[in-house]
Amino acid sequence: MHVPVLLEELILALEINPKGFYVDLTLGRGGHSLAILEKISNGKLVVFDKDQDALDQTRPKLLALKQNIEIIWSDFSRFDFYLENLGIQFVDGFIIDLGVSSPQIDDPARGFSYSKDGNLDMRMDKSQKLSAFIVLNEYPYEKLVEIFFKYGQIPYAREIARAIINSRPLKTTFELVNLVKKVIPALVLVKKNFIKNVFQAVRIEVNNELDSLQKLLEKLPKFLKQGSKVAIITFHSLEDRIVKKAFLDLIRKDKLEFFQKGLPKFSMKVFRPKANELKSNPRAKSAKLRLLLQNR
């Protein structure tokens, strides 16, 4: 069962307007969207996901609750195209949860988990060609080193890349796990689980996650108005750094007007999971919610 992270904090922070317009750019299993639908009456919700399985599983639950909803299969970086086609100019609240969902992690066939043996896949969108299998079996040594350094921050990037080249073809997640265990000393892995970082790096590359996030953040301001909010939940420092910079850039851009009008156009708040949530949902440990508010 997928438990949405920071749900209480997100819903309270959004201060949902019953007549408002909301966009969930990462539907997943619908935890955040279902909570929003319960609070909007004459409003509207548009949801996106690039994982067709997530849409198929969640669509019946959403439509059983309300009909004022649009469900779109797409990477979130293209959200502007769909909103413009729907004639939508402004949005009261955006929700983006950048985590991998529990059903994705728990299904060995998806290849996201290093604790379950399965095919090397890791595609959020199963219709795309690029998969973990292609990355690990076809990328040249230099490219593998780059993604392990850049997306995994792994000091053993060169050694892992060399071992991958020498062990091809790799077919399963456990083959990759065992390879990493042979390369990185056991005492090092006890202190820091670099296997997690290896899987993270490959997943980011397969799904073009950071580039998509950057494109999304560049497009968001166009759809904001006074009172609009953007809630983004991050799970690792790479994506959080990108979100933080984008929000701070908007805040700093407005410095002159702030001194003239006495009210910043944008402000930011940060929320972390409470102790009771961490106890019931260990996967929330690394989660962080950043909220951007347009004040005027």
Swiss-Prot record:
Q: What is its EC number?
A: 2.1.1.199
NCBIfam families this protein is in?
16S rRNA (cytosine(1402)-N(4))-methyltransferase RsmH
Q: State whether keyword Lyase applies.
A: no
Name of the protein described by the UniProt record: Ribosomal RNA small subunit methyltransferase H
Subcellular location, record wording? Cytoplasm
Report residues binding S-adenosyl-L-methionine. G30, G31, H32, D49, F76, D97, Q104
Which controlled-vocabulary keywords does the entry list? Cytoplasm, Methyltransferase, rRNA processing, S-adenosyl-L-methionine, Transferase
Instruction: Briefly state the protein's biological role.
Output: Specifically methylates the N4 position of cytidine in position 1402 (C1402) of 16S rRNA.
Top-level lineage group: Bacteria
Q: Which residues form a coiled coil?
A: none
Q: Answer yes or no on keyword Lipid biosynthesis.
A: no
The family this protein is said to belong to: Belongs to the methyltransferase superfamily. RsmH family.
Which terms under GO biological process does the entry name?
rRNA base methylation
Recorded catalytic activity of this chain's protein: cytidine(1402) in 16S rRNA + S-adenosyl-L-methionine = N(4)-methylcytidine(1402) in 16S rRNA + S-adenosyl-L-homocysteine + H(+)
Q: Which HAMAP family match?
A: 16SrRNA_methyltr_H
Q: Which Gene3D superfamilies match?
A: Putative methyltransferase TM0872, insert domain, Vaccinia Virus protein VP39
PANTHER family to which the protein is assigned, alphabetical: 12S RRNA N4-METHYLCYTIDINE METHYLTRANSFERASE, S-ADENOSYL-METHYLTRANSFERASE MRAW
GO MF terms on file? rRNA (cytosine-N4-)-methyltransferase activity
